[in-house]
Amino acid sequence: MKSIVTSADMALMNRIFRYDSPEKLPIYYEYGGHAYRGVQEPCRVCREALDANMVRYTVCGRIDESLELRVEITEYGDFAATEFLAFFTNCGNAETKRLRNVRIVDGLIEGEDAALIHGNGDTCREDGYEWFRDAVDEKMTLTPVDGTSCNGAFPYFRIMAKNFGVNIAVGWPAAWIAEIEPATGGAHISIGQARFDMVLRPGETMRTPRVNFLAFAGDETRGMNLWRRWYFSHILPRENGKPLPPKYCLHTFNAGGHPEFTGITTENQISGIDDYLNAGLRPDIWWIDAGWYPCDYDWPKIGTWKPDTARLPNGLAPIGEKCDSEGIQLLLWFEPERVREGTELAIAHPEWLLRRTKADGTRDENSLLNLGDRACCDWVIDRVDSIIKEGHVRVYRQDFNFSPREHWIQNEAENRIGALENLHVQGYLRYWDALIARNPGLWVDSCASGGRRNDLETMRRAVPLHYTDVGYGNHPIKQKQHREMFEWIPYFRAHNMRWDNPDGSYGRENHTPDEFAYYAAMAPSLTDMTEHDAPKEAMALAIRMREIWRKAAGRMLDGDYYPLTECRKSNEDFYAMQFHNPDTGSGFFQILSNTCNRKRVFTAKLRAIDDGVYALTAGDGKSRMVVDAKRLREGISFELPRRSSVIWFYEKA
């Protein structure tokens, strides 16, 4: 799409810490009992054009004879955006003095009537994905609760002031902190690693979170769509250099009656693929989740990273080769950071494990693999890389199903607070970077009991195909989740599960997908829960709805997003949204009437519609109409029975 960035947007760069000089950098830290701001002379400044739209300034200086500070500031020329990251390195032969309270950004965002718009992220409960708007009239602290980056506080938030706003994102796959408080002239913001108070050992480097700011003139909706455009341009990973297209996923869940994927065999995977192909359903992704390794049908028994030869005597290669021959990408699940007793890693390398004692005095059954140990990280890189290559894996999926916070805290020294966490984060990112570099075309799916670790540093390398473990088939909960994802992390996946009962309430029993379940799962990627041996009628429905989904998903990735309703997680509401490409004058809107909605008529008032006449086509292609722009803007009404949905595609006639 053509740029919508204006001179008014770019004039706001000075409000988001545009680079001026080393001593005016917004970094703050305390070292040896003294507080410092910026980088003091003497220092070196290097300016590098990363591409036509990005310039990076690297500022290096010495704090004393042993501690070096390097700050990287990136400015974007195609958006009013800045980015900050810093590294501290001990260049000496002895431990440094104490370094603490490091804040990569600590400064003032000028503006009147500031308000903070923020969320609680993925809590792994139904109360997750909530949003709040608070006037900045007292100090507020945002920080996740368990050592993952999105549980209890979402690392994407916004400050709105009079006539403009700033989108802010924290890139730290662990415990970050952001403090926002009122100050003369605006809002003071301070962002860093939540726990950082340590000496650095000789040769050691510690880094800060990476923080991004994107400023915009106008209202929140404009700020949201500028963020989406920036994300698609600069963050979303590409597939072989091309934008990631919609992905349709299939699998054999609970194969052989065993939980998750503990029952997969070479035979049932290949026959499952053939069943779908013979029915006319060709997936983009063939999904193998937890349980393909030796685990005695207990998938959390993790730590032996090799295929279970009892079920997969020739490894994963026959399945991967089958996928390659059919033009399908094989996705494979890993959880490398968790280790259980009795597994290969626990027996061979106990020195790589961080253990913790629970509050009741017993040992946690989960040990944390210390990716901050370079030898450990190298071993995991080599082992997983070999599985990827041997298995023809095209999508690497990583999960993380427990909290690491206490594992770090219980194993750190008094003068090394936050060090294990910091080194682990560095190892985690190095691990992913190595896998991607070694396997051209590989892309990554990020998961942590759903969406607990989807900070921006992670999202530079991955997409969240599984953004939550909550509410797959509870449609109002899913609508609330999608509302946040479309705004901040706009490539994600949904299931077409349905858990609703005949009376419109929701339980946990999953029912066969129907048309409504497909409409409730409109997202850039879809996992179709239609079974590989489903009857012809179910396969026919899947084929029909897949085409509607794919057309809509393409527009989601090529248009601005406009929510047309509030989203309250209520089965009594309408849910509606619009995606619009202003360059082509085309898009679609969807209206969904939830299971207990007493209203029958919804009036859709479309956004961003230029003057002219528009041709509208129903998703199923059975209905068409021609409508002028004035009517679309003022509202066009549709009658829907409860538990139904419509999609209308439109284009300028």
Role assignments for model-derived ranges:
Residues 215-220, 256-264, 292-298, 337-342, ...:
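Flexible loop/turn segments at secondary-structure boundaries
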Residues 208, 402, 428-627, 635-648:
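Active-site-proximal substrate-binding groove within the catalytic cores of carbohydrate-active enzymes
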Residues 89-94, 279, 594-598, 609:
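Short solvent-exposed strand-capping/beta-turn motif centered on an Asx-Ser/Thr pair
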Residues 1-181, 185, 192-196, 615-627:
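Polysaccharide-binding surfaces and accessory modules of carbohydrate-active proteins
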Residues 86-88, 308, 321-325, 375-456, ...:
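Active-site and adjacent substrate-binding regions of carbohydrate-active enzymes
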Residues 243-382, 393-395:
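Aromatic-lined carbohydrate-binding/catalytic grooves of carbohydrate-active enzymes
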Residues 214-247:
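Terminal connector regions
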Residues 198-217, 642-650:
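Short Pro-Gly-centered flexible turn/kink motifs
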